[in-house]
Amino acid sequence: MLQHKFVKKELIDKGWSGDKKYCVTDEHGNKFLLRVSPFEQYERKKSEFEIMNRVAALGVPMCKPLEFGTFDEGVFSIQTWIDGVDAEENAQNLTSDEQYFYGFEAGRILKEIHRVPAPEGIEDWEIF
């Protein structure tokens, strides 16, 4: 059951997942990312949420997982909101040096993420 009370909900019509994604705002003006998935994906989404907690504990700059559960629309997770711009739309506005810097930084962050062991039953991602 949702522990947060939201006063505003805006659909985010981007991204690669089939999840419904929303920018939600609480009564204090704080923004969060709300992801909603079908009930059938409960176990998978629970595992993703647990992995996100382990990755966040490493200090990786990311949306921090706050809450997970079910409600009348399906399985949900609530994460902290990070303001920013869409890299796909804005990368061409950066200099070559800036693009290199952000690409290098993304690789460094990905290396940190790979410190988290692959879950049981999933092929070890060290081979990638």
Model-derived segments and spans:
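Juxta-kinase regulatory segment immediately upstream of eukaryotic protein kinase catalytic domains
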Residues: M1-K8
